Amino acid sequence: QIKIKPAYLISGGASGRNFYNNFNYNFIKIFLIYFSSTVFVIFLYNLIDLRLLDAFNLSFTTISSGGFIPTENLSNILGNNLQIFILSITLLFPIFNFFLLHDIITRKFSFRNYQEDLHIGSLIVILTLLFYFFIIPNEGFTNVFFAITSSLSTSGITIYAPDLDLSFFFILLTIVGGSVISTSSGFKYT
């Protein structure tokens, strides 16, 4: 006779034990990471003089990988390079692993556990520098960085309107960013 174990008893979860037995612990931990990240991003957006409603919507866009733009054109919200750069930095949150910030804060960080994030970070730096210096040197650094992080985070938002059509490359970057673990709910969980 074959015994089938119910899916909720399969071991796993944030602590590596039975997810069902640790559901409350895992739920609270994940909720606090999402909540604190969202509040931190809203705080950052308020520091760079974005309206509260725009900051609220953009924080949901960055944390959950897209979908909450309050206007048709993002350039109506972002007025200077500092705002574009901060938005690009906050787009890095859903690109990297879910517990990366948690492990850094709790001093449990190890490069061995986050090799994929190291590769993605290296890819972002290399592609941004390559595009800025060789492919589209007339475009500003913040716009290039924003286009790369937006594509890799699969959010699909941009203010970049190039003379040179790089749509195919940005679509490939979106595929690469979407194929790394999971971006269906924003943060990546491994």
Predicted regions and their residues:
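Membrane-proximal intracellular helices of multi-pass ion channels
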Residues: 1-190
